[in-house]
């Protein structure tokens, strides 16, 4: 965590994928999606120090622009036996909207000679547009609240701090997502009634890691990666039924990163690329992230 002051982080993520392993196969014919997400993060690190602990708070506001190409049927059926089949054409749709906002009311950090530690609590607020009647790609939000707990550390391998290993752990606890209305038994006197049937996605664990080396003043290069795994079962109905081969959601990626800073202007930035080499019931593709930070 940086020294006390106000900071603006501008995260720019570019994500492309054309397959979601697990949902009916390893590739969706004629489907591609590209999304650009700009996420300003406002962070305040207080000047207070209690028992060598630094305090801070932050908020993220993600805005999403996406293009997705898919095939749709058109024209009259070209055959009717044993079931109707149609010609298909490829169309591209674009969308823009606000996604779910993240509020971090508490960030704590400790700085030692060779180690830095940070922990935080945050709440994801379902501000993004979401409707259970929408096609999954028409939603910008998740439709539920999420509690997130983070713990991270950086270990400097030499006294000059030119080599570093960083780990950041996230644990997300998801709440209920309204799903649909169904007829269910209510009581012996009222055998059927209308009730909501909710879906609660299982808890998600995410590990982010990086190994970096300072190659010049203010310039670091390294390798980064992440692994995300659903650790508890999803409760309630899902759009696609049970997961493929009864596996829980996961995704993993790896790639290079370069960081730089210009302290005279209070500017720093990083550029990273991740190739997602494994996924289950989750999009699998390519992620490029450009981050620019300004301190005040």
Q: Where does each model-flagged region fall?
A:
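N-terminal low-complexity, intrinsically disordered segments
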Residues: 26-48, 54
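Short loop/turn motifs that connect adjacent beta-strands in outer-membrane beta-barrel proteins
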Residues: 1-5, 45-56, 70, 110-117, ...
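Residues on the lipid-exposed face of transmembrane beta-strands in outer-membrane beta-barrel proteins
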Residues: 10, 40-46, 103-108, 121, ...
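Outer membrane beta-barrel transmembrane domains
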Residues: 27, 177-296
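Short glycine/proline- and aromatic-enriched beta-strand/turn motifs that initiate or cap beta-hairpins
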Residues: 1-27, 44, 188
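Transmembrane beta-barrel strands of outer-membrane/channel proteins
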Residues: 8-14, 57-65, 119-125, 167-173, ...
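Outer-membrane pore/translocation modules
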Residues: 56, 62-196, 200, 245-248
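Residues that define the transmembrane beta-barrel architecture of outer-membrane proteins
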Residues: 32-40, 92-102, 141-147, 199-205, ...
């Amino acid at each position: 965590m940086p020294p006390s002051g106000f900071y603006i982080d501008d995260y720019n993520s570019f994500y492309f994928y054309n397959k979601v392993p697990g949902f009916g196969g390893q590739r969706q014919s004629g489907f591609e999606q590209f999304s650009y997400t700009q996420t300003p993060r406002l962070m305040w690190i207080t000047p207070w120090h209690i028992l060598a602990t630094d305090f801070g708070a932050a908020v993220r506001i993600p805005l999403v622009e996406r293009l997705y190409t898919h095939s749709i049927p058109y024209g009259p059926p070209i055959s009717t036996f044993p079931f109707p089949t149609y010609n298909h054409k490829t169309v591209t749709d674009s969308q823009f909207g606000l996604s779910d906002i993240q509020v971090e009311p508490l960030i704590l950090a400790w700085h030692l000679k060779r180690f830095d530690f940070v922990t935080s609590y945050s709440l994801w607020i379902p501000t993004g547009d979401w409707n259970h009647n929408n096609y999954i790609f028409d939603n910008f939000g998740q439709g539920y609240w999420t509690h997130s707990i983070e713990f991270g550390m950086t270990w400097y391998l030499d006294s000059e701090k030119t080599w570093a290993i960083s780990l950041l752990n996230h644990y997300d606890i998801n709440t209920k997502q309204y799903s649909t209305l169904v007829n269910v038994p209510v009581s012996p006197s009222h055998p059927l009634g209308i009730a909501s049937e909710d879906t609660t996605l299982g808890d998600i664990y995410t590990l982010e890691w990086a190994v970096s080396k300072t190659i010049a003043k203010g310039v670091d290069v390294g390798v980064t990666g992440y692994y995300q795994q659903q650790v508890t079962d999803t409760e309630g109905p899902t759009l696609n039924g049970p997961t493929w081969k009864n596996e829980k959601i996961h995704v993993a990626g790896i790639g290079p990163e370069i960081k730089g800073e210009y302290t005279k202007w209070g500017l720093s930035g990083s550029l990273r690329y991740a190739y997602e080499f494994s996924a289950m019931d989750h999009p699998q593709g390519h992620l490029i992230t450009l981050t620019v930070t300004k301190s005040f």
